[in-house]
From Swiss-Prot:
This is UPF0301 protein BP0319. SUPFAM superfamilies: VC0467-like. It comes from Bordetella pertussis (strain Tohama I / ATCC BAA-589 / NCTC 13251). Belongs to the UPF0301 (AlgH) family. Pfam families: DUF179.
Amino acid sequence: MTDSHRPDADDIPDDDELSTDFSNQFLLAMPGVVEGSLAGTVIYICEHTRRGALGLVINRPTDLTLATLFERIDLKLEIGPVKDEMVFFGGPVQTDRGFVLHAPAGDYTSSINLGELALTTSRDVLQAVADGNGPARMLVTLGYAGWGAGQLESEMAQNSWLSVGADSHIIFDVAPEDRYPAALKLLGVDPVMLAGGAGHA
């Protein structure tokens, strides 16, 4: 993985066709293959082009609440239960930077429209949340997971990840500890069978 890809709206990767495009897919880390901070993770792939890929871990909450995060950036969040929601570890790259995966897309300064969802990195989405008119559903992370050109394809060929079409219900409505098994159910995969087989469905 690499930190060479910077996810700004003015730096959206080119849309050259890929043989396999993992955008809007869940990647599930294969036990015993993916190690370190990404072991056991489910990653939602926001962008995947010839220049690389960018995703957010969706099942690794931190000890930081949204209220505390907002306080750190001089915003006051008093809306419950939003203020008690947890901030997630989004990946090992730029862990001091916030990323908001949300629905509906809305109109924010630095956003990438992902179809049903959007990824926003600008402060205005958090200001909207503080004002009580933010996105109806959101997941806030610090950091992201990034791959350089060809890296994700290589890792898939090495069976490092399982992939399946993303389901926003799992992102927003399923408890973090249940998101990995819930994503596995989309594949019809038994956890004990993960040691072998191809990296994608």
